[in-house]
Regions:
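Noncatalytic, beta-rich nucleic-acid-contacting surfaces in large DNA/RNA-processing enzymes
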Residues: 29, 120, 135, 160, ...
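A short, charged helix-loop
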Residues: 132-176
């Protein structure tokens, strides 16, 4: 983690690929570790809006607990411990979740710092909307992100029953804008936001304002294949190029479409990339390739 100014690192949304990477790294680094102590800083605002427990003493319940297993789905990571306790992390719209071998690499600021009995640490600082919650097994059932991400809605990565036939069935069940089908409360998959959406529809050659009811079977196939390819590429590349993993290392995935293409030409056809406000965010696309 040397040389990285964490305080100035750009906030970036965390989607399914980055969540999977974090969960795997947390498993490698924290499994079986026992919590010695915790510290909370600058948490009042997050507590008021529900991003952290309203009672700071709720985190005391984690002291003395050992990490049993880590599960993840969508944008949510659930660190399960003994004594029926959990630390629920959902970095959704930006968070620095970092592992430290000793106190020498601890950042100046954090929202939650967890110290383990072996002298290692986990620090979390939310840089956007997200969740850092201490919860019993029973309490975890009622947490919004748990209900949202650990639901019947399929994950586009890591689940064998998410086939093209299943994807087509979900798309056909209700005609809606293509963005609403990929991102948000009515999405047919979990774990994706505007960043992944822009890449997926660009690679699939689909205009951002299309309705799912107008898609041909070939276009649905392209959408399904593009989703798989983009997400797996991000996982293999260690996440987005402007995102930091658990060890403070930046990802290497450069988006094929998004804000990085501002004032650029399409690498496939040479047309000027355009931007529109759509579905609660800015969407970049190629007006020639995406129809």
């Amino acid at each position: 983690m040397k040389g990285i100014a964490f305080g100035t690192w750009r906030t970036v949304s965390v989607e399914l690929p980055e969540t999977q990477i974090l969960a795997e790294q947390i498993t490698d680094s924290l499994l079986s570790k026992k919590i010695k102590s915790y510290d909370i800083q600058d948490s009042t605002k997050l507590q008021k809006i529900g991003f952290m427990n309203k009672k700071p003493k709720d985190y005391e319940r984690l002291v003395g607990c050992s990490v049993k297993t880590i599960i993840h789905r969508g944008n949510t990571i659930r660190i399960q411990m003994n004594k029926k306790m959990n630390l629920v992390l959902c970095p959704d719209y930006g968070a620095q979740i970092l592992f430290h071998k000793d106190e020498k690499t601890l950042p100046k600021k954090h929202h939650l710092k967890v110290e383990f009995t072996d002298g290692t640490f986990l620090t979390i600082r939310q840089t956007g909307m997200g969740l850092v919650y201490s919860a019993t097994d029973q309490e975890a059932k009622d947490i919004y992100v748990i209900k949202r991400d650990f639901s019947d809605i399929p994950s586009p990565v890591g689940e064998h029953d998410f086939t093209f036939e299943r994807f087509r069935e979900l798309l056909d069940a209700k005609g809606q804008n293509i963005k609403a089908a990929i991102v948000g409360k009515t999405a047919v998959v979990v774990g994706l936001s505007n960043a992944a959406f822009q890449e997926i529809i660009y690679k699939a050659g689909i205009h951002p304002k299309r309705n799912t009811s107008t898609l041909t079977d070939d276009e649905k196939h392209n959408l399904f294949d593009s989703m798989k390819q983009i997400l797996n590429s991000r996982i293999c590349s260690g996440g987005k190029e402007n995102w930091l993993n658990l060890y403070g290392e930046p990802g290497r995935h450069m988006p094929v479409m998004g804000p990085n293409m501002k004032n650029q030409n399409c690498p496939q056809c040479g047309a000027a990339i355009e931007k529109i406000a759509h579905g609660g965010g800015q969407v970049y696309f190629c007006p020639r390739c995406q129809r």
